[in-house]
């Protein structure tokens, strides 16, 4: 009996030792794998994220999962007043909530906003509209020079910008350290009196790499001469932060308005009210910095790229969570002690409050534009409408900044609501002035037409979706195919990696529904 017990104990011990040895060997294998690093020369073809996979396989595999975020909301159908607010501008044609990074480049190509160029010198938008979509952009800035990159039409680089947002946008290919790859961010930080990327802590860098794109910006018209002395004009991405950003819980929107007014800048002239307008981009950084998480030093990556554990390996999840509430155990619950359901309820309440003020603000803004258009029709002069247009310009930018980054209501809920209320207030002040102006010109009972559906709003904005869609499909069948053919021939991207990226014929479009 004693012999049997001794034998059993020995077998258990041997088994445990075998498991321990296996575990040690597996951890050693993982350690060696993690110790792999590119040579001092860096990663050849670093713009292709798959070239990083041999060194960082887990990060690459999680990055590929950005493909899973393939749904979107047609924001113009959800909020038709936006069409009136942006009438005469590309956003009145097509505006969707973002999908995963995997789709960012193709969605840019497919958007009605980028038009239907027929060659490298045609189309409505400048090259700057590629800037936040691909690691090929910093490559082109390095190869061609910053001013040359920002000179010309969007279609100029159609066959060159083919790799979607990936490793090389945020990492040094020699060390994998975080790195800013575009020059406008540091210039903006310096203008705001903030530390540059290189001067910042590692924790701050985990937000600043995101701020390369998730910021408010405009295209600064810049005259220059090339090496041959030829005069050229660049449209350079520039951050309007000279009056500060994220101070004392304020995103800096009023400072941006002051900046834009002082340089007499406008993105476009509204085709109904004839107001020189400003279009907010995606100011995620500014609102994060003014909100409680930013003030407490919680980075973008803490919530959107939380650490995950695989065996003995801890790494940052590069799926870039669209909604951290989908993985609360990895993000929220590392700090918060409330239940998941309670936290979800709090976030939902913030969203509902934003939605309410959003509807009120843009209803007033849309009506202010239409009433101004009626005043013009009745004979009101530019001088009579000067204050009205100033209020519309300022009010719409405040409200637009509040919603242009879809997570603002969470990142800085108080600032989001403040700006929506302020924008609505400006629009209402404009409408009160318009009552007097309209009456002066004999219009006593004008009621703005309905714009409660996307179709009604686009008709008022004179947006011909059928014609725009036909032009876009022709572009996709011609010039875009030439781009793809050239990119493939020159080995600029891996067609296999992106074979499913174009979902235009799968109903994943606001204008080409199947």
From Swiss-Prot:
Binding positions for heme c 5? 293, 332, 335-336
Query: What residues bind substrate, as annotated?
Result: 217, 282
| Residues binding heme c 4 | 300, 303-304, 411
Which co-factors does it depend on? Ca(2+); heme c
Q: What is its EC number?
A: 1.7.2.2
Q: Which residues are listed for heme c 2 binding in this entry?
A: 167, 170-171, 318
For this UniProt entry, what is the primary localization, expressed as one broad class? periplasm
Its EC top class is oxidoreductase
* GO CC terms of this entry: outer membrane-bounded periplasmic space
User: Sorted alphabetically, which Gene3D superfamilies does this protein's record hold?
Assistant: Butyryl-CoA Dehydrogenase, subunit A, domain 3, Flavocytochrome C3, Chain A
Q: Where does Ca(2+) bind?
A: 216-217, 279, 281
Record's subunit section: Homodimer. Probably also exists as a membrane-associated heterooligomeric complex.
- This chain's protein is named Cytochrome c-552
This chain's function reads:
Catalyzes the reduction of nitrite to ammonia, consuming six electrons in the process. Has very low activity toward hydroxylamine, and even lower activity toward sulfite. Sulfite reductase activity is maximal at neutral pH.
Q: What else is known?
A: X-ray crystallographic analysis includes a sulfate ion that is thought to be at the substrate-binding site.
Residues in the signal sequence: 1-21
What family does the entry list? Belongs to the cytochrome c-552 family.
**Cofactor comment in the record?**
Binds 1 Ca(2+) ion per monomer. Binds 5 heme c groups covalently per monomer.
Q: What is the lineage of its organism?
A: Bacteria, Pseudomonadati, Campylobacterota, Epsilonproteobacteria, Campylobacterales
Which pathway, per its entry? Nitrogen metabolism; nitrate reduction (assimilation)
Which annotated residues bind heme c 3?
101, 210, 213-214
One biological process GO term for this chain?
anaerobic electron transport chain
**Where is this gene product found?**
Periplasm
What keywords tag this UniProt record?
Calcium, Electron transport, Heme, Iron, Metal-binding, Oxidoreductase, Periplasm, Signal, Transport
- Spell out the Pfam families in the cross-references: Cytochrom_C552
